[in-house]
């Protein structure tokens, strides 16, 4: 009996996984067991299952995640996406084809599609692994713990059925400016860290024009944005410290270590000798997600397109694919979109996916896996 991806998806969207993934992981394990596989859950909370062919061959991994961002949005089936009038989306309305709810596209729709391929693909040689992580939306401790030695990764995320071969990385940290505290009535006796924020912000603005990596062929220019600023302890005191939090969206070949060293040196050069600064990354258990780019002419990308995937393009958000791309060619693919013409979709109250796209994504990944492991 064929795997019922739409029934699985409907139940998955109705299973909250924004605070704790235990219930959703239990449902996934039960589904895998019911289909005759023997899943395991490792110490990092990853759900793993494997199928093997009759001969040696490549190892392909299907990966996505089961956690969602809060709050939980209830399940609903409808003919059109939320906030879209009949016919205005450019697709003919179909009764009940649109599933609304938190996680419907990010990433329970992609999960249903990957499960279809995992269960239904004919494997003649090599190995197919399903690896579903528990906390992609926060620290990616599950993905960071995986060591699968694969030859290719297909990562399930909402790409509108396009095959995404690249994505920017994301780093976050705080620039701390240190001055000299003094009475506000005698400002010349101190060195204001808050006043120094002005040239530092200018230096942040100029960083990519003078120091940063060149424009990437597909990902374009990196971005560097100050997002939070904080400083001062008393209203009548020259502040000795000011902190600026920055968000970095990187492109290859920039690395986490290289960016830190270059940014700190660049910003320091804009300060007078009476002040100093330092830059520290925000503390987290796992490495930040680095930028990656799989060649557009790689076998994995070509196979996905031949199977029916859409255009080759970058993915619009940071993803755990970053960890896997260090080891093997990696693409991001799945039903649903991050945003449509009417606004945000993933991580938003309007989150939805089309059931027909979930089915089509499953067909595409199944065909690609059969080509790679046939």
Q: Which role fits each region the language model picked out?
A:
Residues 101-112, 123-124, 191-195, 352-359:
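Short, conserved micro-motifs enriched in small and acidic residues
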Residues 84-97, 117-131, 204-213, 372-374:
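Phosphate-handling active-site elements
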Residues 174-374:
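Metal-dependent amide/peptide-bond hydrolase catalytic core
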Residues 1-102, 319, 373:
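Acidic/His- and Gly-rich active-site-bordering loop/insert found
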Residues 112-172:
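Acidic/histidine-rich catalytic neighborhood of metal-dependent amide-processing enzymes
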Residues 72-73, 161-165, 231-236:
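Short beta-strand/turn micro-motifs at beta-sheet edges
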Residues 32, 49, 62-65, 114, ...:
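Buried hydrophobic positions in well-ordered alpha/beta secondary-structure cores of metabolic enzymes
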